[in-house]
Swiss-Prot record:
EC number: 3.1.21.10
Name of the protein: Crossover junction endodeoxyribonuclease RuvC
Organism: Sulfurovum sp. (strain NBC37-1)
Residues reported to bind Mg(2+) 1: D7, D139
Cofactor binding note of this UniProt entry: Binds 2 Mg(2+) ion per subunit.
Keyword Lyase belongs to the record: no
Catalytic reaction equation(s): Endonucleolytic cleavage at a junction such as a reciprocal single-stranded crossover between two homologous DNA duplexes (Holliday junction)
InterPro entries in the cross-refs: RNaseH-like_sf (IPR012337), RNaseH_sf (IPR036397), X-over_junc_endoDNase_Mg_BS (IPR020563), X-over_junc_endoDNase_RuvC (IPR002176)
């Protein structure tokens, strides 16, 4: 089973694909989609095309996305919501369903502490996946954490 974890942002999208063979999980691929265009509609197209490439390059069984969290800047929330809507539609068209996790759920699942910092989450993700090198930006480790969180739920469903 291949799980795609997504950390959506207004300028970057972190993603991670984990494979679970029923007993253990392994990292297939992780990276960052950087939005380079300036106009909002072009940014949305760039994001959807990028996720389409990822979905078509891998046999994705399930997708997990970080839920939108409250931000102090209403413009940022609106922009992120538009990205999120386009991303959601693409995933629904290709996969048929996706799962959402709040930042609190992800932090708690990976570190045991819902108030963990991004650095603490990154440390635990690298430890769980056996990665020694530094991973930057943290959008990538956030996507890994989202995929790990979903994988924990999948394992509970299988019991």
């Amino acid at each position: 089973m291949n799980i795609l974890g997504i950390d959506p942002g207004s300028r970057n999208l972190g993603y991670c694909i984990l494979h679970w063979d029923g007993k253990k999980f392994s990292l297939v691929e992780a990276g960052l989609l950087k939005i380079k265009t300036k106009e909002l509609q072009e940014q949305i197209v760039e994001l959807v095309e990028g996720i389409d490439i990822i979905l078509k390059a891998h046999q994705i069984d399930e997708v997990a996305i970080e839920d939108i969290f409250f931000a102090y800047n209403p413009q940022s929330v609106l922009k992120l919501a538009q990205f999120r809507g386009a991303l959601s539609l693409k995933i629904l068209q290709e996969i048929g369903y996706f799962y959402e996790y709040t930042p609190l759920q992800v932090k708690k699942a990976v570190t045991g502490n819902g108030k963990a910092t991004k650095e603490q989450v990154a440390f635990m993700v690298k430890r769980l996946l056996g990665i020694k090198k530094e991973i930057k930006p943290l959008d990538i480790t956030d996507a890994m954490a989202i995929a790990i969180t979903h994988l924990q739920r999948v394992k509970m469903r299988k019991k």
